[in-house]
Amino acid sequence: YLPSGIASITDRVAARHWGKALAIHELAPNTAFLLAPLMVEAALGVVEWRTGLMVLGFAALALAGIFKWRGWGADYCGEIPDRRVMAAIAAKPAAWLMMLSFGIGISGTLGLYSMLPLFLVSDHGMERQWANSLLAFSRVGSLAAAGFGGWAADRFGPRTTIRVVFLLSGLLIMGLGVLRGPGLIAAVFCQPVLAVCFFPAGFSLLSRISSRRSQNITIAVTIPMAFLIGGGIVPLFLGWMGDAGEFGRAIMLIGLATTLASSATLGLPGPEVDTPEGIA
């Protein structure tokens, strides 16, 4: 979905408003983080899990029909992933930096989200229900924060926004590893609010590093690899360190990596790259 979805938004919206438009787009995953567990818990009291999956599938089909009927998309066809296009993308340092940046961004949201309940229960002695509820409600603030992140990307530039988000989010992640009591709870609530501000700026910048026609391939290559890093390797690392009794230290290392990644943004394209045609 993402290659076509992001390309459709950036094609129909002026480049100076990409941050705000993509922030609206990012309301969807942030809302899902909050509502999906609550909806599943409520549905399981009425129907079995297979019925829930069927409803989800029918909803996806219905939305496809609605989009075909009333939706709009880009008025051009993207590139096919042939050797020429892939080589051109691989030759861009900015593409590799964006892959790393999205990996860091995803590790600060999905990666931590999947492992924090275990950390709170095993290292801080919280009840499982309390830990899950705390984590769910900590995502409420991220709904408004995504909009702020989009505004900041348009106002100060996506590169500056990403740098500040990584710096502050990394410090809060390190706080998760060392704080206890009220300080820990404050960090649990504040860190995701900052972390989600990355994505409007990240997608805005990712859409600028290649031509309009090859934008779909750039996104299709970058995001899966970033998910492998942030949603695969990082949770695996946290689990492995948790088994060794070093859960807190592992979270501190993730926070340190996030903070250091703020300096890597110096290699990303700056605000002068502001047209849909990108830099290649």
Language-model region placement:
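Cytoplasmic helix-loop-helix junction between adjacent transmembrane helices
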Residues: 1-27
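Helix-loop-helix hairpin linking two adjacent transmembrane segments in secondary transporters
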Residues: 25-68
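C-terminal membrane-cytosol helix-exit motif in multi-pass small-molecule transporters
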Residues: 58-76, 264-268
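Extracytoplasmic gate region of multi-pass secondary transporters
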Residues: 94-143
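Helix-to-loop junctions at the C-terminal end of transmembrane segments
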Residues: 146-157, 242
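C-terminal transmembrane helical hairpin of 12-TM major facilitator-type secondary transporters
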Residues: 159-202
